[in-house]
Structure formats: C-alpha cells, structure tokens
C-alpha cells in the first residue's frame, strides 16, 4: 500500500491544559503511529503554527516510522491566547509536558526551531528523563551574541510586524528570514497574513507579554552542561534572526552535541534545505 501524505485537517486535535489556575485549550497535530515519537516545536513569528513551520518535514518522519506531534504553543495557531509575564519557554515546556502526559507518551525526541529550540532546552532541563534525542535549529540559549548587536535586525522586524501586522511589514520580515527569497510566493504571503489577522488576540497578547517582561527567553547558557541527551544543532550560515555564534555556544555547553551549518541558509533550515535537513535528522534519530 502506497504512503498517504498527512493532512492538517485529518490530524488536528485539542486537549485542555491547566496553567496558572486557568484552563487553556491547546491545539496539536498527531501524525503517524510509530513506537517512537518526535515532537516538533515552532518559532515565535506572527502567524506561526506547528503545521506551517514543518510542512516540508512531517511526511518524511512519518514515512520513516515515527509518530509526529506538532504543538501550537499558547498564543499561536488554534491554541488559546495568553499574556505571559514569565519565561515563555518554560511555559511552552509545561504545556508540552501536560500534552504528552495526557497522550501517555513516556519519552519523546524533541525538534525545535527558534523559540521551539529554546523551549526544547527548557523541557529537557526540567524533565531530562522524558527526552530521547534533541534537535535544536536556530534556537539560541537566550544569551547575548559575541559578534552581532542585539536585538538582531530580524527580531526588530518581527516585533514591528507584531505591532503593525501589514503585508508590507510581513514582506520586510520575510525578506531577511530566508536566504533565497525566490520561493516566497504571493500565495505564501497571503496565507501567512490571513493566519496572523485571524487571531489578532495572539498578536496583541504577544506585545503585552513583551511589555510585561521584555526577557521572555532567559539565558540557559549556565545550565547547558546539565543536558545529557544526544543533541544535533542545526544553523543557517546566513541567519539574521539568531546569530550563528549562538549555535557555537550550544555546541560548547552540551557535551553530547554536534553542529551542522547549512550555507546559503537563513533562519528556516527545515524549509530552505528541506531534503538535506530531513535526511540529516533521520540519520541522527536512527543512530544508537
């Protein structure tokens, strides 16, 4: 029987999660039926979702025999919105912990992009026994860069888009989001803009969260040595959102880690170099 590609609608699920005395309705996609589970955590861009972030990576993982969970973090996608005044990544980690507990999944491999990478580190530091392998892609430690002024130009444009969600600002952000912009079609811009504007509460609450606590992503650098999981770090040589030296900091801090850098690549390695990225990850996950 030939493989049937996964669809967003067929894999869409919801669970209720208790957080700080409130009940949040959390959306995720549940794909495949493998014995091992890979959780994919998206970045913090306006309009981001688990499915949109990893659309080019889901089928290869499922076809290789993995169960794949794509979480919409609170404040993104179809999940409930929230104003967060603490560590955003620890919040995301707690939400994920509740979801995998309710799904009765004992151990997961974590693959996180940008904010999702930082959240994956938070989850691993809090519940190391629940993590198999770790893939961190363009997700920094929360610390400062040695070579690039902070915030980076990418983060400045991202924050501008949150405050003024227009097609012009979206194109300004995406223009430096990827290295080769020729794949950025009008249809992609339209879909992303519609995604953003359909949940203005997410946009407004992200800005309120930054005002309540500008340091949403604390520096995990001093704790990286606690991570014992085998870790694959992936970066774009031309990333203008999270500087490449953040990847070197992860490599230095996590003993069981290795770093792969894609040339001609921005902040979205899993999309810009999908075939090579998928093979890299599958080979890493298959290793003993």
UniProtKB/Swiss-Prot annotation:
It is an enzyme of class 3 (hydrolase). It catalyses: (2Z,4E)-2-hydroxy-6-oxonona-2,4-dienedioate + H2O = (2Z)-2-hydroxypenta-2,4-dienoate + succinate + H(+); (2Z,4E,7E)-2-hydroxy-6-oxonona-2,4,7-trienedioate + H2O = (2Z)-2-hydroxypenta-2,4-dienoate + fumarate + H(+). The active site is at residue 267. The record marks 192 as: Catalytic role in ketonization of the dienol substrate (substrate destabilization). Keywords: Aromatic hydrocarbons catabolism, Hydrolase. Pfam families: Abhydrolase_1. InterPro entries: AB_hydrolase_1, AB_hydrolase_fold, Epox_hydrolase-like, MhpC_alpha/beta_hydrolase. Residues 38-273 form the AB hydrolase-1 domain. Pathway: Aromatic compound metabolism; 3-phenylpropanoate degradation. Its EC number is 3.7.1.14. GO terms for molecular function: 2-hydroxy-6-oxonona-2,4,7-trienedioate hydrolase activity; 2-hydroxy-6-oxonona-2,4-dienedioate hydrolase activity; protein homodimerization activity. GO terms for cellular component: cytoplasm. The record marks 114 as: Transition state stabilizer. The keyword Hydrolase applies. GO terms for biological process: 3-phenylpropionate catabolic process. Belongs to the AB hydrolase superfamily. MhpC family. Homodimer. This is 2-hydroxy-6-oxononadienedioate/2-hydroxy-6-oxononatrienedioate hydrolase. It comes from Escherichia coli O139:H28 (strain E24377A / ETEC). The gene is mhpC.
């Amino acid at each position: 029987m030939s493989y049937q590609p996964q669809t967003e609608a067929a894999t869409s699920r919801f669970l209720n999660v208790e957080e700080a005395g409130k009940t949040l309705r959390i959306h995720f996609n549940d794909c495949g039926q493998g014995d091992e589970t890979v959780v994919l955590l998206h970045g913090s861009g306006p309009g981001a979702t688990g499915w949109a972030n990893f659309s080019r990576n889901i089928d290869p993982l499922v076809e290789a025999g993995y169960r794949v969970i794509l979480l919409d973090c609170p404040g993104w996608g179809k999940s409930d919105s929230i104003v967060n005044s603490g560590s955003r990544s620890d919040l995301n980690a707690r939400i994920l912990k509740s979801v995998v507990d309710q799904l009765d999944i004992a151990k997961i491999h974590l693959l996180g992009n940008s904010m999702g990478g930082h959240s994956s580190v938070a989850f691993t530091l809090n519940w190391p026994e629940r993590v198999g392998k770790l893939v961190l892609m363009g997700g920094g430690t929360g610390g400062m860069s040695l070579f690039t002024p902070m915030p980076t130009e990418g983060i400045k444009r991202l924050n501008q888009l949150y405050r003024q969600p227009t097609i012009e600002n979206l194109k300004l952000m995406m223009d430096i989001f990827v290295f080769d912009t020729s794949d950025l079609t009008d249809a992609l811009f339209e879909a992303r803009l519609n995604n953003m504007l359909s949940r203005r509460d997410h946009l407004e609450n992200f800005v309120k969260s930054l005002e309540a606590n500008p340091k949403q992503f604390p520096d995990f650098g001093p704790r990286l040595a606690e991570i014992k999981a085998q870790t694959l770090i992936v970066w774009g040589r031309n990333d203008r959102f999270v500087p490449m030296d953040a990847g070197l900091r992860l490599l230095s801090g996590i003993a069981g880690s290795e770093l792969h850098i894609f040339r001609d690549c921005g902040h979205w390695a899993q999309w810009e170099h999908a075939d090579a990225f998928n093979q890299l990850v599958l080979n890493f996950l298959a290793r003993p």
